[in-house]
Amino acid sequence: MRLAPVAIWGIRADPAVMTRVARRQSMTTHAADACLEACEAYALMLRAAILGADFDSALENARGSYGPHIGPIVAGSWRGKARDQISSSGFVAHSLEAAIWCVANTDNFDDAVLLAANLGDDADTTAAITGQLAGAIYGASTIRASWLEKLAWRDEIEVLARILAFPAGRLGSIAYSGN
């Protein structure tokens, strides 16, 4: 789920438009209903978190009418699960559940991403998805400098993120409003 850019752009867009973009960007490689629903729900979570919502409020913001794979996860089916009950197989529902579970069961960016990576299986996917939410919840300033220093194209990524969030002529204050 390569959704952070969509959610960053989405802080200034109507949530319905942002979710359409989230679904469409998924269609380029993953067009199954579960993939589209996961992208919609996660984009809404990320958008809310970027705008300042805490974890529970961001999750609540993603509530909606989803199918049998994604609906239970957004409703909280992962709550109370132990680590050995969380799969990181690469299937979209497993990846979404694992990412949400990792952030819910930690209190900082490092621990969330490391927990995701240490689940094994499709660890890079799970950690990347987790990192998007952990970064949105805990803030970019909480990411280890040593990790950021190794990031390829870091300067370009940061510039593009600023452009997505604050396009020319649209600078100003933003805050979570429950949408």
Give the role of each language-model region.
Residues 127-138:
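Short, small-residue alpha-helix embedded
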Residues 1-106, 112-119, 133:
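Amphipathic alpha-helical interface segments
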Residues 18-19, 130, 145-149:
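Short amphipathic alpha-helical leader/targeting segments
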Residues 124:
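Conserved catalytic/binding loops enriched for acidic/polar residues
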Residues 136-179:
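Conserved glycine-rich phosphate/nucleotide-binding loop
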